[in-house]
């Protein structure tokens, strides 16, 4: 099972290009491909020379770039959607594009939680945002920093593009449906700006700044962070899954029962709770290959984004299929 995210027109670090993606699809064009929604009726048993193609998040270029290539080679695929961004962010798909892809018979749409937001795992930073940080990281972190804005700023700053990220702390994070985690307390951003803009702090090296802040956050954790309760966590998990599921099922008149964990961060509670929300299968990002008899509890994926070199991709595919 292959995993992709974006497909860019040109070569970009960390993101597969249109030409690179087409080479991947050309290589697998003679294999049997399936959509996730087809697996249950097959009892999760696939042909020996078969492959699953997946995309996470639901970016616009899945339609503008990848879809035409899938059609060219008649390859089936599944896109795991973050529905909060659909119709609300220019970098993501809209429902008309999603319907067109689904009605083509080639593309299925499944669950990736409603928002894909992270939570702070530990009151410790690992670095700072640079001026040229990409939109993907900023978009993910915006939900964290927005919690720390003042009431006035929350009314004014509604989008990650409105926030200056330069110099903000990069925390250790996890998916908000994986662990309880922590939120920033309201007003954190004002306090943070106050001491990082002081002459004493500015004169420190990046390493010294990190050490200073980690000591400060450890000593005054309750002043800056708020632990998420078990009740809040479970409510969040339920909302993220059920709202994601509701929107896809209502808009496409289909069942959505496969959950791709954001970042591959698995739920640390009793997974039966998530199953009761209508989830039958869980999709990972482990880098492993699946057996012909797929385990619906753990559908593994190989990260196609990271195999940009065609010779390496070919070698990987030969290893996987010769091994089986």
Predicted regions and their residues:
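Generic enzyme active-site microenvironment
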Residues: 54-55, 110
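Acidic (Asp/Glu)-rich catalytic clusters
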Residues: 29-30, 67-74, 94-111, 275-276, ...
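Short active-site segment of divalent metal-dependent hydrolases/proteases
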Residues: 59-60, 115
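Histidine-centered catalytic micro-motifs
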Residues: 2-6, 109-116
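C-terminal active-site subregion of NodB/CE4 polysaccharide deacetylases
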Residues: 1-54, 60-62, 121-123, 135-324
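Structural detector of well-ordered beta-strand residues that form the stable sheet scaffold
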Residues: 78-80, 110, 260, 282-283
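A short alpha/beta connector and helix-capping loop motif
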Residues: 63-83
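Charged helix-capping and loop-helix junction motifs
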Residues: 17-20, 91-96
